[in-house]
């Protein structure tokens, strides 16, 4: 996967700093704040009970920009979040936001977006996309703790594998599945053989990871079937037992 250009990286950094400057104190709400491909969005964050996904634009159309508007809309719609464009302009060698305030405009309506105005007290149940993205974060942080070098990762529940990393003998892939505690018994997907058969064509070793999520108001009761719903911004209890090596993938 192609690396981003230095010019885009500089623009991206300026956009991120602008977002951080909109809040008092340290900004701790980033969902995506890295330049590792693939790119559905360039930046994303949670504020209150709302999610915001950002695609950077160059108003002069001279910047080589990774990803697409289609990708932005897919992750925003899949997560029940807001798809935002962030127009940027290079002036005297420095990148600046064109739109006022947060610098965001709706990708669907073209109106200015102020994230603070969209926060509410509504309890919003986490989408499958949010949970998958969270599960991938759990697995990759565990890999990094074990000293593994990550190559790429993505949080879409509709794409496999979720993670590539450098193993002891070369690149390895990880298929990640997340489960809501008490709703579905964890198991490999029904099309598991097809997934693995396809990934075997890469010639790389494979792994499988299950992440089970429960509400902070819930407990991991193996016999329970009345698990509490998972609401955005309320935290999660997690059960993750590590990678399962796929030594005989089609069995």
Predicted regions and their residues:
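Short N-terminal signal/transit or membrane-insertion segments
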Residues: 16-38, 88-107
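Repeat-unit-sized solenoid/scaffold elements
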Residues: 119, 130, 163, 177-179, ...
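Beta-rich nucleic-acid/ligand-interaction surfaces
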Residues: 158-164
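Short, surface-exposed basic-aromatic patches at helix termini and helix-loop junctions that form
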Residues: 144, 165-169
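Short N-terminal secondary-structure initiator segments
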Residues: 35-58, 101-125
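Domain-level recognition of nuclease-like catalytic cores that cleave nucleotide substrates
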Residues: 90-114, 206-251
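Acidic-basic catalytic patches of nuclease active cores, encompassing PD-(D/E)XK
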Residues: 1-35, 114-153
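Catalytic cores of nucleic-acid endonucleases
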Residues: 32-93, 168-172, 176-228
């Amino acid at each position: 996967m192609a690396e981003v250009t230095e010019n885009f990286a500089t623009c991206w950094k300026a956009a991120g700093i602008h977002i951080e400057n909109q809040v008092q104190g340290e900004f701790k709400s980033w969902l995506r704040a890295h330049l590792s491909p693939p790119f559905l969005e360039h930046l994303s964050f949670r504020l209150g009970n709302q999610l915001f996904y950002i695609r950077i634009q160059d108003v002069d159309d001279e910047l080589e920009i990774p990803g697409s508007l289609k990708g932005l809309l897919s992750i925003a719609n899949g997560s029940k979040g807001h798809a935002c464009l962030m127009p940027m302009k290079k002036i005297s060698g420095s990148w600046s936001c064109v739109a006022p305030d947060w610098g965001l405009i709706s990708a669907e309506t073209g109106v200015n977006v102020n994230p603070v105005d969209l926060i509410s007290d509504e309890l919003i149940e986490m989408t499958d996309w949010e949970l998958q993205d969270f599960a991938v974060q759990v697995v990759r942080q565990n890999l990094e703790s074990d000293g593994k070098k990550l190559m790429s990762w993505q949080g879409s529940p509709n794409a496999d594998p979720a993670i590539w990393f450098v193993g002891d003998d070369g690149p390895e892939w990880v298929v990640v599945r997340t489960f809501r505690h008490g709703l579905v018994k964890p198991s490999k997907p029904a099309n598991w053989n097809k997934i693995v058969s396809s990934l075997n064509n890469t010639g790389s070793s494979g792994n499988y990871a299950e992440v089970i999520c429960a509400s902070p108001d819930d407990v991991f009761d193996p016999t329970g079937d009345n698990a509490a719903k998972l609401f955005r911004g309320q935290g999660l209890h997690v059960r993750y037992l590590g990678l399962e090596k796929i030594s005989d993938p089609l069995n």
